[in-house]
C-alpha cells in the first residue's frame, strides 16, 4: 500500500513526519501493534473493525518483519 492510497489523517501524519514537524517512531512495528491492540480491545469500536485490527496485529506478530 502506498501513502497516497491511505486516508487523509495518515497522509497528514506522513507529511508531518517527513517534514520533521513530528518525530519518527524508530520501532514502528511495535508502535503499530500497540495501536492495533488498542483498537481490537476497545469495546466502543464496532466488532468488525476490532476483528480487522486483531487480524492485522496477529499477522504482524507472525511475520518475519522486526523493528531495527
Swiss-Prot record:
User: Pfam families, per this entry?
Assistant: UPF0253
What's this protein's family per the entry?
Belongs to the UPF0253 family.
| Protein's name according to its UniProt entry | UPF0253 protein AHA_2115
Q: Which organism is it from?
A: Aeromonas hydrophila subsp. hydrophila (strain ATCC 7966 / DSM 30187 / BCRC 13018 / CCUG 14551 / JCM 1027 / KCTC 2358 / NCIMB 9240 / NCTC 8049)
Amino acid at each position: 500500500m502506498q501513502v497516497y492510497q491511505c486516508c487523509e489523517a495518515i497522509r497528514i501524519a506522513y507529511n508531518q513526519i517527513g517534514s520533521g514537524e513530528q518525530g519518527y517512531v524508530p520501532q514502528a512495528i511495535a508502535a503499530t501493534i500497540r495501536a492495533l491492540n488498542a483498537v481490537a480491545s476497545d469495546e466502543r469500536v464496532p466488532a468488525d473493525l476490532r476483528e480487522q485490527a486483531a487480524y492485522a496485529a496477529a499477522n504482524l506478530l507472525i511475520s518475519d518483519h522486526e523493528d531495527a
